[in-house]
Amino acid sequence: MSDPCECFFDHESAMQRLLAMLRNSQADCTDTGCDNDGLSREGGNTMMMWTLLWTFMAMALYVMRPNSMRSDRRTADDAAIEKPTGSSDDNTPPPPPPSAM
């Protein structure tokens, strides 16, 4: 089963598909050369549209990212909130470890 369509079509249908593909290729190409490069104009245009769409979506997501993902300079208040420092009193004992009970 080298042909995936072999499960659905018999040998005669496969030959008809092959002949149809050959006839279609003869309309595009002759013995001396081909009229087009093998890609239809719509195919190349569609690829360009998809590329532009993905680029636009990536730029929109980058611009609308939340503040937590931005690497802007943070103020001293923000740094104090994110990285707590020890208390100013050095004589306080550390908190007791959690009990196993």
Curated annotation (Swiss-Prot):
**Location of the region described as Disordered in the Swiss-Prot/TrEMBL record:** 71-101
Where are the compositionally biased (Pro residues) regions?
92-101
Bias kind Basic and acidic residues: ranges = 71-81
| This protein's GO CC annotations | endoplasmic reticulum
Name of this chain's protein: Small integral membrane protein 14
Species of provenance: Caenorhabditis elegans
Lineage of the species this protein comes from: Eukaryota, Metazoa, Ecdysozoa, Nematoda, Chromadorea
Encoding gene per record? smim-14
